[in-house]
């Protein structure tokens, strides 16, 4: 497995991202150890909250949520998934599998010895995080999902997703900043778009981002389907607090909160919300998300 690391110089002086870098080695069952980057802010003895990003972003997505959550007393941890941000990046699309991503995040939880954590997930963060919660639930006390879901290959896949999947694999460019800007309500300034582009100096660093759409299980014979269906069944027995906060302007996932709220017992009586945001709800409404989490006791 060939691995690249984005040069540190790419992350200097990014707008709104003054956080110190932390690293830990993680491994999947069938991979060597890889270096995973994460943010660790707020009081070390505060209740941990883990913020898990998705495609094609990194912990930069949480830059407006981290300070208020830390000020609210949380120990705020935001990892970069393998292939993203400042984490190691295997160079082949085939190096990435759904199971490996789940195992890398589980390994990260174990290395940090996290317990009683609040887990906030969005986009691919939910595809990974909901599996982790279902399979490693003793580390997680509360779940928050924003514009995410757990695919089980039941039902029709929108044509728009097939187009996105082909674009991600075959397009000569994968402009992360412009993709984020296309999924927000508010205008994303060029300097912020540059922050999303920072991890990807050229195509050799993009295999992880190009792989993610290919890994969404949309066919019943996908190797991830059995584990996802088992995780969905386990979430049907999840009685710990569960909160859904969705951006209602998201054309694909704006209503994906409904099956989650209906299925998960811990969702009953919680202050779920749909707010004026698009898919990248953290970019549109980061401080509001932080405030809703802080007030959710």
From Swiss-Prot:
Q: Which residues form a coiled coil?
A: none
- What function is annotated for this protein? Catalyzes hydrolytic cleavage of carbon-halogen bonds in halogenated aliphatic compounds, leading to the formation of the corresponding primary alcohols, halide ions and protons.
Q: Where is the AB hydrolase-1 domain?
A: 47-148
Which GO molecular function terms does the record list? epoxide hydrolase activity; haloalkane dehalogenase activity
Report the active site residues. Answer: 123, 250, 279
**Catalyzed reaction equations:** 1-haloalkane + H2O = a halide anion + a primary alcohol + H(+)
EC number(s) reported in the record: 3.8.1.5
Read off the Pfam families from this record: Abhydrolase_1 (PF00561)
> What is the phylogenetic placement of the source species in the record?
Bacteria, Bacillati, Actinomycetota, Actinomycetes, Mycobacteriales
- Name-wise, this protein is Haloalkane dehalogenase
Q: What's the family?
A: Belongs to the haloalkane dehalogenase family. Type 1 subfamily.
Q: Which InterPro entries match?
A: AB_hydrolase_1, AB_hydrolase_fold, Epox_hydrolase-like, Haloalkane_dehalogenase, Haloalkane_dehalogenase_1
Which keywords does UniProt give here? Hydrolase
- SUPFAM superfamilies from the entry? alpha/beta-Hydrolases
